[in-house]
Amino acid sequence: MSVESFTPTALQFTQGAAHKVKSLVDEEGNDRLKLRVFVTGGGCSGFQYGFTFDEDVAEDDTIVEREGVSLVVDPMSFQYLAGAEVDYQEGLEGSRFVIKNPNATTTCGCGSSFSI
């Protein structure tokens, strides 16, 4: 019998996203806030991304730190986000956090819905 260990693929947190999180945290005046990224069922492609700020971190959450701020992902969402990149973009459509997910087989035009 053999036992294989599993090492999850890292979640990337870009410098642009980290700077925006830091700016928003500073604006709120609460350095305990972290950006929580999650996946829920729904959207036009089956799953959708969500973002919120959270002070709490569960024992089994994955934490990615950059530029003195933290991105937090729960274990259920991490399985869909392993290897993805969380970025912040500003453009004609407005400003928003975006996820570039290599696991997604299809994505919606809005960028917040995907399928695997």
Swiss-Prot record:
Family membership: Belongs to the HesB/IscA family.
Alphabetical list of SUPFAM superfamilies matching this protein: HesB-like domain
Cofactor binding notes: Binds 1 iron-sulfur cluster per subunit.
Keywords per UniProt: Iron, Iron-sulfur, Metal-binding
Organism in which the protein naturally occurs: Pseudomonas fluorescens (strain Pf0-1)
GO CC terms, sorted: cytosol
Gene3D superfamilies: HesB-like domain (2.60.300.12)
Gene Ontology biological-process entries: iron-sulfur cluster assembly
UniProt cross-references to PROSITE patterns, sorted A to Z: HESB
Listed InterPro entries: FeS_biogenesis, FeS_cluster_insertion, FeS_cluster_insertion_CS, FeS_cluster_insertion_RrpA, HesB-like_dom_sf
Presence of keyword Transcription: no
Protein name: Iron-sulfur cluster insertion protein ErpA
Binding site for iron-sulfur cluster: 44, 108, 110
Function: Required for insertion of 4Fe-4S clusters for at least IspG.
Cofactor(s) of this protein: iron-sulfur cluster
Oligomer status and interactors: Homodimer.
